[in-house]
Amino acid sequence: MAKFRRRTCIILALFILFIFSLMMGLKMLRPNTATFGAPFGLDLLPELHQRTIHLGKNFDFQKSDRINSETNTKNLKSVEITMKPSKASELNLDELPPLNNYLHVFYYSWYGNPQFDGKYIHWNHPVLEHWDPRIAKNYPQGRHNPPDDIGSSFYPELGSYSSRDPSVIETHMRQMRSASIGVLALSWYPPDVNDENGEPTDNLVPTILDKAHKYNLKVTFHIEPYSNRDDQNMYKNVKYIIDKYGNHPAFYRYKTKTGNALPMFYVYDSYITKPEKWANLLTTSGSRSIRNSPYDGLFIALLVEEKHKYDILQSGFDGIYTYFATNGFTYGSSHQNWASLKLFCDKYNLIFIPSVGPGYIDTSIRPWNTQNTRNRINGKYYEIGLSAALQTRPSLISITSFNEWHEGTQIEKAVPKRTSNTVYLDYRPHKPGLYLELTRKWSEKYSKERATYALDRQLPVS
């Protein structure tokens, strides 16, 4: 009888060990080749679970996003309008590796809240309708209702903050510094101009420059497609930027192969303007040429389609960037095309700047756009993109983004949050600073690798 009980105990112990091993194996499983829009493997990831957005009576709760099953945390309290990061998250800057001025990150200063702006700005983003009415009728309408319901699938550690809050700007600069990012590319509209969901932000630039300088960061400008943008008003606006901000110590200049240090301007949606118009501004023979003037610079065009390559050449741009964090969404954002784009840029003496993002999800504002969602895979997607960028040996790398929360491309710290109607994605099982830590790791790697091939190709190394 004792022998039978002993044998039973042994069998039971082996069975428990088998079940435990199986569970651990499933937990560690990560598909290496799952692409976005591909359903295989996504249900295995603890980062994905159902997210619902409260938008009043029009919302259909069956049409929500996949989000992290681990967000069933009990008793999560509502976050205040602007929260202060924990002191434990603050790093000793003296112990960090050097900044990498060849690593840029796109930064947005369009957020507002009642405390600083008298109302919510951008956090209450409307749900955008699909262009096909037959599809649009199947999705919710209305605006988000901050602070608990915001236009994002993630929730910031700082809450529904204002970009005017000096403490928020300072925290952002600290986070960038901790990630060894050297340059922020500031989304910019001309004075008294704004995007359709925002307010003018040019008056924030002096504070952003000052806070950036405190952490030895540099600021370049990401010129948005403001109404009627053309060669004539672009000249005027570039002149304005250089005259007003060009003498600030945080104003970014890139040293070219010839040794000239020139301002850099990313031009979003550059393809909207005809090449002939750009050529007036960006070629030496253009009727409004900015070349060889005090306002000359390096103008970087957004490449979306393959055909844009030759439009960019004709326009007189100095380089290309790809912006979108969605691998496979456009020709330019597809990692598999970066090697040929780099060859094209080398052939025509253009700067190639691949853009890498940690993931993509914009269904809080475009609920019909699930096919373009890109799962973060606990940081793996980000690292795959950074590795693909490094393989092209680029002069610069851009990150999309620091804080474009609407499209879920942010590397800014995010925290778990749930309300009665909304459960947000987060970075668990990792900490809120995961993507800053990954950025720092790859910034160091890029800096070391770039130093070797920069010498081979006689690129500037500082």
From Swiss-Prot:
Residues 30-462 are lumenal. Undergoes proteolytic cleavage in the C-terminal region. Residues 1-8 are cytoplasmic. Highly expressed in the liver and kidney. Expressed at lower levels in muscle, pancreas, heart, placenta, lung and brain. Its EC number is 3.2.1.130. It is found in: Golgi apparatus membrane. It comes from the Eukaryota. Keywords: Golgi apparatus, Hydrolase, Membrane, Signal-anchor, Transmembrane, Transmembrane helix. It holds the Pfam family Glyco_hydro_99. The keyword tRNA-binding does not apply. The chain crosses the membrane at residues 9-29. Coiled coil: none annotated. It is a single-pass type II membrane protein. Optimum temperature is 37 degrees Celsius. The keyword Transmembrane helix applies. It catalyses: N-{alpha-Glc-(1->3)-alpha-Man-(1->2)-alpha-Man-(1->2)-alpha-Man-(1->3)-[alpha-Man-(1->2)-alpha-Man-(1->3)-[alpha-Man-(1->2)-alpha-Man-(1->6)]-alpha-Man-(1->6)]-beta-Man-(1->4)-beta-GlcNAc-(1->4)-beta-GlcNAc}-L-asparaginyl-[protein] + H2O = alpha-D-glucosyl-(1->3)-D-mannopyranose + N(4)-{alpha-D-Man-(1->2)-alpha-D-Man-(1->3)-[alpha-D-Man-(1->2)-alpha-D-Man-(1->3)-[alpha-D-Man-(1->2)-alpha-D-Man-(1->6)]-alpha-D-Man-(1->6)]-beta-D-Man-(1->4)-beta-D-GlaNAc-(1->4)-beta-D-GlcNAc}-L-asparaginyl-[protein] (N-glucan mannose isomer 8A1,2,3B1,2). InterPro entries: Glyco_Hydrolase_99, Glycoside_hydrolase_SF. Its main location: Golgi. One of its GO terms (cellular component) is Golgi membrane. Belongs to the glycosyl hydrolase 99 family. PANTHER family: ENDO-ALPHA-1,2-MANNOSIDASE (PTHR13572), GLYCOPROTEIN ENDO-ALPHA-1,2-MANNOSIDASE (PTHR13572:SF1). This is Glycoprotein endo-alpha-1,2-mannosidase. The lineage of its organism: Eukaryota, Metazoa, Chordata, Craniata, Vertebrata.
